[in-house]
Amino acid sequence: MTTWDKCLKKIKKNLSTFEYKTWIKPIHVEQNSNLFTVYCNNEYFKKHIKSKYGNLILSTIQECHGNDLIIEYSNKKFSGEKITEVITAGPQANFFSTTSVEIKDESEDTKVVQEPKISKKSNSKDFSSSQELFGFDEAMLITAKEDEEYSFGLPLKEKYVFDSFVVGDANKIARAAAMQVSINPGKLHNPLFIYGGSGLGKTHLMQAIGNHAREVNPNAKIIYTNSEQFIKDYVNSIRLQDQDEFQRVYRSADILLIDDIQFIAGKEGTAQEFFHTFNALYENGKQIILTSDKYPNEIEGLEERLVSRFGYGLTVSVDMPDLETRIAILLKKAHDLGQKLPNETAAFIAENVRTNVRELEGALNRVLTTSKFNHKDPTIEVAQACLRDVIKIQEKKVKIDNIQKVVADFYRIRVKDLTSNQRSRNIARPRQIAMSLARELTSHSLPEIGNAFGGRDHTTVMHAVKAITKLRQSNTSISDDYELLLDKISR
């Protein structure tokens, strides 16, 4: 057993399985008397191993070999190439000692040419703190089977098409823009940036773009992915020394669709790679479509240069659909499932589930499954029984006085201003927003809502709801405020 074999056993005990397999196992250490040469395969590995594991490697070799040694770090594969850095440890060196560093030679990076697919060699199931180099989250596991062929991106799902997307005031602009870029990619709205809360149809629209663009031009190279997969692709290309292939694939797309782009914020390496990918595609007239749960300027940690580029094209929102659209979504979904759903039952479900489309469809499935299991029609009574917990949660969480307090705090006014007769814009607009929220988030009737706002007529509430619905489509500031308030009130 070599000295390095002994060291590996000790190092393995101090690291997670993922760290050991990702960073330590791939390196090769050659010993020549007191000289230990650490071959790190590429510059990324070398820098990360020196900064992250250098002290651990040094102290472990000292423990197994003795203090009088020299450690050399190379950014090459093991084949006797030039050395980049040398660390000399004398008899007094220990784990916490300051080591001397001598730069002997700066090796030129060697490009590795491989086939379009990459062979993954990791079988990791654990993930620890080795994300510092790339900045990816600890929750993102990069797993693969031995010798599994690796391809980039994610498949488009055939069920996500424009015909199955129910259009309403809350999403009609986004849908129209999505259709335009699927027919004429790279001409208008580049990039197309779609934002909105979870479960409101962003992914549906994005994949519908890809599916329709493929119908229009079967030869178009369309790459769909999400930010998590993009990060995994990038990290794996580095681990497998195949960044050229990563760049070739992503930068040769005719249409690039990336879902949940907000998750690259704070991931320095990935963000930089995406920045260059964006520039390459944009300059070549290729279409870029992105989705996020926030408006670009509100994505915390996102580089300013990316925020600026997202503004090159069109930014549109998808909001929670209004009551009529929610009913239409339920009726279409039931029809697609081959089930009959009475209009009044659809209206009941739509009135009581106002969080997002995903939960709306989940409630429908619950009602249809229960009615089928009990050999009953999906009546309002069945829906009431199925959704009683959902309704209780809604009623428990959302009350008009709570809405008034949250809105007043948000706009830094008093609750009594909302119920007063003041008509100044800084009071009237928040009052309209609060009324619209009360209509959307509670089961109170229009007269009840009007009464809670200083005894106003139900027609005033109707006007407020229509005004805010229209403003959310044309005024980004109002739309953003409304979404933030929805989130605050629903917590």
From Swiss-Prot:
Region (Domain IV, binds dsDNA): 372-491
SUPFAM superfamilies on file: P-loop containing nucleoside triphosphate hydrolases (SSF52540), TrpR-like (SSF48295)
Chief location: cytoplasm
BP terms from Gene Ontology: DNA replication initiation; regulation of DNA replication
Region (Domain II): 69-154
GO terms for MF: ATP binding; ATP hydrolysis activity; DNA replication origin binding; lipid binding
Domain of life from the UniProt record: Bacteria
Pfam families hit by this protein: Bac_DnaA (PF00308), Bac_DnaA_C (PF08299), DnaA_N (PF11638)
Job description of the protein: Plays an essential role in the initiation and regulation of chromosomal replication. ATP-DnaA binds to the origin of replication (oriC) to initiate formation of the DNA replication initiation complex once per cell cycle. Binds the DnaA box (a 9 base pair repeat at the origin) and separates the double-stranded (ds)DNA. Forms a right-handed helical filament on oriC DNA; dsDNA binds to the exterior of the filament while single-stranded (ss)DNA is stabiized in the filament's interior.
Subunit comment: Oligomerizes as a right-handed, spiral filament on DNA at oriC.
Domain comment in the entry: Domain I is involved in oligomerization and binding regulators, domain II is flexibile and of varying length in different bacteria, domain III forms the AAA+ region, while domain IV binds dsDNA.
Record-given protein name: Chromosomal replication initiator protein DnaA
Native species: Francisella tularensis subsp. tularensis (strain SCHU S4 / Schu 4)
Gene this protein is translated from: dnaA
